[in-house]
Structures are given as C-alpha cells and as structure tokens.
Amino acid sequence: MKRNPSQVDLPVESILNRLDPYVFGSMSLGHEDVPFETRLSMARYAMERCGWFHTSHKYGSTMDVLAQAFREWPMRIPKCIFKLSGDSLDEVRRQIDLQLEKLGVEQISIGQLHVGGALAADFNAGGKCLDGLRAIKEEGLVGAFTLEVHPWTSHIALDHLRGGQGRDIIEGYSFYFNPLQRYALNDLFALVLETRRPILSIRTVGGGPVEKQAARPERPEDFMQKRSAELLPVYAQSDCANWVDFSMNFVLSQPGVICTIGSCSTPAHLDDYLAVLKQERPSFNPSLTRKILALQTKWSDEKDVHAPEWSM
C-alpha cells in the first residue's frame, strides 16, 4: 500500500515527501507500569522495522527509553516527528533544544507545532514568529513544520490557511484522523482538501477495536462508545481482516493523507500495522468511505465544534 503523491502540493525537496505511510507512535514506551527493559525491547523492535518515529518529551519516560535505544543502536536511529508547543517562540526553541539534547540527535525531521496564546495571534497576523520559525529551519534544527490541529484550534489553522501567510513554513497539518475521529472541523477539513495540503493522520485505530468500544455501557460522556455503535454496521460491511486493516486502509486512501501515526506497545501489534502495508489490494470501498465521511461530518457539527479545550 502506497500513498498517492499526486494528491498533495509539496515542493520536491520537502522532507514530507520522504515520510513512510506508517509512522511508529512512541507514546506507549512511556507507560511506566511496563518494565523498562520490555519497553526498550519494543523500541529496538520498532527501530529495526520502521524508518519514522513520532514522539514528545511529554510522553512520560518515553524519551528515556528512546535515548538508550538510540545510544545502543546509532546506525538505526529513525527520522523523528517531534511535538512542539508553546505560547512564544522562545518556548518552542527551548523544547527543540531539550528534545535534541535528550535524544542525542542533531535535527528534528518534522516539528509538529501546536501554537497558542500570543504565538497563535502573531502567527496568523504574519508576525515576527514566522521569521523565527524560518530561522530555525535555516539553522537546520527542524527539517519541516506541520501545524497540529484540534477542534478547539481549528480556527487558528483555518485563518492561517485562508490568509496564506507562512505557507513556506507550515507544509502540512497533523490531526487525529481515523474512522472514529477527524479533529479538523468541517470547514477546515474542506479547505485543506481544496488546497491540496498534506495531512499527517494521528491515532490510526482511534482507541482500539470498534467492537470493544461499542460494547461498553452507554454513558452520556462516552462519545466514543456512541460513535463506535454508529460505525459498527459500516465496519461489518467491509472485507477487511480486522480493525487495524480497516482503519489503515480507510485513512491511507483519503486524499491528502501522506502517513498515519499509530502507537503500539507490543511487537504483535506493530506486525499488524506492517502487514497491512504489504497488501496489494484495490482502494478502500468508496461506498463505505462515503458513509464514514458522512458520519464524521455529523459528529463534527454535533460534538467537535462545541468541545472545550482538551475535552476530547
């Protein structure tokens, strides 16, 4: 399975063109209820099989695990997408320095930028922060930036995309995108597709098998259980082998999607992801795609657009 590069507008030299369809999400390496050596073994297993990792210094002890794995196996260090956030450019720079020093690498291949506060205002006004981000790239600290999107920050990305400022800096958009979630609100998602901007989809399987999520007791606050119950009949109509197969085939078939970022804690789970990439099969069923996208449009209007910050 390969992405279709004709679906996006990217400079030939952009490092985003070198992304693999699947990026190993490292969050589970920070789960301290699992022995350190077990997590280290998982990191080595992923390094042997995956050319790209996604990580953050906010993922518990994930960076301790990765730092040791990178020291032990420097010839297999993957390219990395790092989460970067802050209300000022100085804060973003501090996070860059912190993470580079922690992992002992010289460059953040892709910086997934979450802007807030004064930085967000300056960013959308075409202010000095854009020159600061350009300088970071020119120094070789970051190969490319994408803008991280949540329902409560979609307006920032929408204003940025409409205004066109800093398009040379922000090369794509990173957000939850799987059969159960699409965190770019409807108007932003439509404009991203219209302008052929690259999408880095996050959270490949949306929290786990749809059957298990749908089987949870109904509770008003459990919106994922409700969504799973609505999606379950669509999933049942597919010929996919399992939920991983269904989720990856759906999202990687969508216009603009250049990779999917999925976390896993066991070698067997990672093998499930990689097995899907080896398939030679037609595109995802168009009828099922239309049904999923219709549900996501409805969910965006009903729930996502009203979501308080970090509530989902």
Regions found by a protein language model. Give the residues of each.
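N-terminal binding-site loop/beta-alpha segment at the start of enzyme catalytic domains
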Residues: M1-P78, D131-G132, E138
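Structured C-terminal cap/extension of enzyme domains
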Residues: I15, E37, R44-M47, E72, ...
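Hydrophobic faces of well-ordered beta-strands that scaffold small-molecule active sites
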Residues: D20-G25, G51-T55, P78-F82, I108-L113, ...
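Active-site mouth loops of central-metabolism enzymes
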Residues: G25-E37, I81-E91, G116-F123, L231-A241
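Active-site-proximal loop/turn and secondary-structure-junction residues that shape catalytic pockets
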Residues: S28, H57-S61, L84-S88, Q112-G117, ...
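Glycine/proline-rich, positively charged
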Residues: D33, R44, E48, D90-P179, ...
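Aromatic/hydrophobic pocket-lining residues that form the small-molecule binding cavity
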Residues: R39, L66, V92, G126-C129, ...
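Hydrophobic packing residues within well-ordered alpha-helices of enzyme cores
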Residues: L66-A69, I156-L161, L270-Y273
